[in-house]
From Swiss-Prot:
Catalyzed reactions: Transfers a segment of a (1->4)-alpha-D-glucan chain to a primary hydroxy group in a similar glucan chain
Pathway of action: Glycan biosynthesis; glycogen biosynthesis
Single GO molecular function: cation binding
Protein name per the record: 1,4-alpha-glucan branching enzyme GlgB
Active site: 399 (nucleophile), 452 (proton donor)
Protein source organism: Chlamydia muridarum (strain MoPn / Nigg)
Assembly and binders: Monomer.
Entry keywords, A to Z: Carbohydrate metabolism, Glycogen biosynthesis, Glycogen metabolism, Glycosyltransferase, Transferase
Length: 737
């Protein structure tokens, strides 16, 4: 009778590539009370030699690639190594214990494993003093999963993983592998199809169009402890975000800067320009440049386009050491259909949402995630936690939240299935986002989450305990749309559209908002910011300076896409750098300087950022002068504060030497900022000292606008006589009585 390891059924499964439990057959097996046996599988080999306790022995050859060697009882995995056909001498993968445990299984299949990035994928480690790489993957419907790479000549039968749970987790430790080793998964589906897949949990990949996964050993020594210790305090401070696409900010020798070059230049630039944070368009790995990173295949991997895993850590570390936070654009709403990645990962739609008639999202022709599966939610949650823990990211901006929240997003009737209550809300996505925000805020105080959400879904920034989604901030897409819609109007038509400016204040404090002028507004025929402005060149630049001043003054955090700060003329393209040579032109220099001064004023003026989500931080002064296009309001740091900033925006083209604003009783008023400054390329008007007017003085003055009384009894208010420059923002420091 053949020994058990030559059992025909076991061997046939192994040879045919359908053995799900190779660890039960291979490695060190007990043969009797006094003897163990080393059992090896080497398909195609004629002889196999083993170094056993310093001596070389030839293993017995059996049929179908099975080899064995009898050994003394109690031998350990460290006591022997196997010679491979390529000359490599390595320990036996199947002699080492499997480390995926019951707690791992419980947490992962519940969707709450907060360190899944250290338990799934390719994990460099030592077992019993032997260095190597643990490979772990979830593929519940596979007949076999193997790890393939240069180390086994990409032969799928050499290193099959062991199925360690009935719920589809597979594991194998491969001794001797090191960081830099390339690998993929070879998966045999239930139907027998062989798939070659990248690792969803891979930490690095070959440069696109390559899709090979690369083992990473995270040994970076961080120098940002002071930043991390203070991060929770900074969360309530000013937030002025510079949105950056890494591959097109600056080029050198006709190539994008790498992560390290970018770190050294961008950190200094942000300090110079008074930005508090950078937000990176997705630097998660993605196959297509033209997706800008929003079609992710490597949720745990920095793109290799600009350097290594460690290079991106250096970038973030450098930004922190210069006092700049780093926010990551992150895409948990959909993923691309590329066959090498997650689509139909184990021969079934493992990650995909399948309950709609078509699995593809109509807007992007990508797959949406199935948030009803705990393992899928854990995959996404683990990605976010990985970027915070291992890469020291300070914030995560969740892309396309609306597409996650609504089952019918972008779909016509009949193209979607309602939830169990008959509604269109994706209840599983709601629960995932609540879990995402709860865990991040509990585990990493001071790390911020942002929702790019374009609908009126309620309570985006309300705490989970109060029934909200728990985000820190919501992108105010309505404000952005209405503001740009107004600015695009030619001057004679603006009086009929001033509600575009005033309407957003009706809901400005319903959420904690961020005010973006993002990359989406300067591509695909929408024109650059300055290209949207009407009039001749002088007026366009004046309007851009006005726009930047308007954004700084409005309640809400700030975000500006790169190039807007100096008047980039062409639409943005991911395939070229910004037009930095424009800074040789006076008008562009002026906008750049104006942006710098506005940013400095913002970060140094608590009235513009402290409590800016509260209604008491804002008070209208006048929005009635639609004919001249003037709005004015006060900004406060607290409801009891007498030190306020008066923000005045003139959207028209006329110059008024005397313009009287209604005003609260004042003790003093002085001009802080005028975007029409000659130094900014303006006309130099608007610098006459403001004159405070009592109600009695107001009655005697001739005004250029309809005076709107502020007092409840309808009596004439105080006034402020200012010089109003054309197309400008004025900011005054005011002490109220």
């Amino acid at each position: 009778m053949d020994p058990f390891f030559l059992n025909t059924q076991h061997v046939e499964l192994l040879v045919s590539g359908k053995q799900s439990s190779p660890q039960d057959l291979l490695g060190i097996v007990s043969e009797s009370l006094n003897q163990d046996r080393i059992v090896l599988f080497r398909p195609g080999a004629k002889t196999v030699f083993v170094e056993l306790q310093g001596k070389i022995q030839q293993a017995e050859s059996h049929h179908s690639g099975i080899f064995s060697l009898p050994v003394t009882k109690g031998i350990s995995p460290q006591d022997y190594r196997v010679y491979h056909q390529n000359g490599l001498l390595a320990h036996d993968p199947y002699a080492f214990p499997l480390l995926w445990g019951e707690i791992d299984s419980f947490l992962f299949h519940e969707g709450t494993h907060q360190h899944i990035y250290d338990r799934m994928g390719a994990i460099p480690c030592e077992i019993g003093g032997v260095p190597g790489v643990r490979f772990v993957i979830w593929a519940p419907h596979a007949q076999r999963v193997s790890v393939v790479g240069d180390f086994n000549c990409w032969h799928g039968l050499v290193n099959p993983l062991h199925k360690v749970s009935d719920q589809g987790v597979w594991e194998l430790f491969v001794p001797g592998l090191t960081a830099g080793s390339c690998y993929k998964w070879e998966i045999v589906t239930a139907s027998g199809q062989v798939l070659i897949k990248s690792d969803p949990y891979g930490k690095f990949f070959g440069s696109p169009p390559q899709s090979v996964s690369v083992v990473v050993d995270d040994r970076y020594e961080w120098g940002d402890k002071e930043w991390l210790d203070e991060r929770s305090k900074k969360a309530e401070g000013p937030m002025n975000i510079y949105e950056v696409h890494v591959g097109s900010w600056r080029w050198q020798e006709e190539q994008p800067l790498n992560y390290r070059e970018l770190a050294d230049q961008l950190s200094l630039y942000c300090k110079q320009m008074h930005y508090t944070h950078v937000e990176l368009l997705p630097v998660t790995e993605h196959p297509l440049n033209e997706s800008w990173g929003y079609q992710t295949t490597g949720y745990y991997a920095p793109t290799s386009r600009y350097g290594s895993f460690e290079d991106l850590q250096y970038f973030i570390d450098t930004m922190h050491q210069h006092g700049i936070g780093v926010i990551l654009d992150w895409v948990p709403g959909h993923f691309p259909v590329d066959s090498f990645a997650m689509s139909n990962f184990d021969g079934t739609p493992l990650y995909e949402y399948t309950r709609n008639p078509s699995p593809l999202h109509p807007h992007w022709h990508t797959y949406t995630f199935d948030y009803a599966k705990p393992e899928v939610c854990n995959f996404l949650l683990g990605s976010a936690l990985f970027w915070i823990d291992k890469m020291h990211i300070d914030g995560i901006r969740v892309d396309a939240v609306s597409s996650m929240l609504y089952l019918d997003y972008g779909r016509n009737p009949g193209e979607w299935i309602p939830n169990r209550y008959g509604g269109r809300e994706n209840l599983d996505a709601v629960r995932f986002l609540q879990q995402f925000n709860t865990i991040i805020h509990e585990k990493y105080p001071g790390v911020l989450t942002f929702a790019e959400e374009s609908t009126t879904f309620p309570k985006i920034t309300v705490s989970v305990e109060e029934g909200g989604l728990g985000f820190d901030y919501k992108w105010n897409m309505g404000w952005m749309h209405d503001t740009l819609h107004y600015f695009e109007k030619d001057f004679p038509y603006r009086p009929y559209h001033q509600s575009d400016l005033t309407f957003p204040q009706w809901y400005a404090f319903s959420e904690r908002f961020l005010l973006p002028f993002s990359h989406d507004e300067v591509v695909h025929g929408k024109r650059s910011l300055i290209g949207k402005m009407p009039g001749d060149a002088w007026r366009q630049f004046a309007q851009l300076r006005l726009l930047l001043g308007y954004q700084i003054c409005q309640p809400g955090k700030k975000l500006l896409f790169m190039g807007g700060e100096f008047g980039q003329g062409r639409e943005w393209s991911p395939n070229r750098e910004l037009d930095w040579d424009l800074l040789d032109i006076h008008y562009h220099q002026g906008v750049h300087l104006c942006s710098q001064k506005l940013n400095s004023l913002y970060v140094n003026s608590p009235q513009l950022w402290k409590g800016d989500h509260l209604p008491q931080s804002f008070r209208w002064i006048d929005f009635s002068d639609t004919r001249n296009g003037v709005v004015a309001y006060l900004r406060f740091a607290s409801d009891e504060d007498k030190e306020a900033l008066l923000c005045v925006h003139h959207f028209g083209v006329n110059h008024f030497l005397h313009y009287i604003l209604p005003m609260l009783p004042m003790k003093s008023c002085s001009l802080l900022m005028n975007t029409d400054d000659l130094a900014f390329g303006g006309s130099g008007k608007g610098f006459r000292n403001p004159k405070m007017l009592t109600p009695e003085m107001v009655r005697k003055e001739k005004t250029s606008s309809e005076l709107a009384p502020l007092d409840d009894d309808g009596s004439v208010a105080w006034g402020l006589d200012i010089e109003m420059p054309p197309s400008a923002t004025l900011i005054f420091s005011v002490t109220l009585q």
